[in-house]
Amino acid sequence: MNIAILSKGETLYSTQVLLKAGTENKHVMEVLDPSHCSLSIENGRSIVKFHNEIVDDLDAIIPRIGASNTYYGATLVRHFNAMGVFSIVSAGAILQTRDKWTCSQLLSKANVPIPKTILGASSNLEYLLSNF
């Protein structure tokens, strides 16, 4: 399989471990820095370019999207999905993990114990703190 790791840090330990594991399992591995990717839709076709070269040979992607790149990274994952490329993490999951409230709701719904958590407008701050 041709697999790309979407990561700004090719030299990061976690990225290197993924590259090594993929290569040891006979996959063709590469790292694509999302900040060097451009997206387009042309003639009804989704296209990703990396350093102005079309990326059309991937079977799967492993997103390693940092917090500073969340929304563009999620868009990039969706775009690859539209091209038929499998992703081990969905764009929705990336966005959910960056939203603390949504994450707390999901954990609570799955019966994972979480500490008492409160969200409210700043005009209710005194009331909220008194009930915490």
Whereabouts are the PLM-identified features?
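Active-site nucleotide/adenylate-binding loops and adjacent lid/helix of ATP-dependent enzymes
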Residues: 1-8, 15-20, 29, 40, ...
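Extended catalytic core of nucleotide-activated donor transferases of GT-like folds
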Residues: 70-80
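Short, solvent-exposed loop/turn segments at secondary-structure junctions
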Residues: 10-11, 68
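N-terminal ordered "arm"
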Residues: 25-26, 31
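Residue-level detector of functional hotspots within protein domains
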Residues: 13, 46-47, 71-73, 103
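Redox-cofactor binding/interface segments in oxidoreductases and associated redox assembly factors
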Residues: 62-63
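Glycine-rich, highly charged phosphate/nucleotide-binding loops
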Residues: 35-57, 67-71
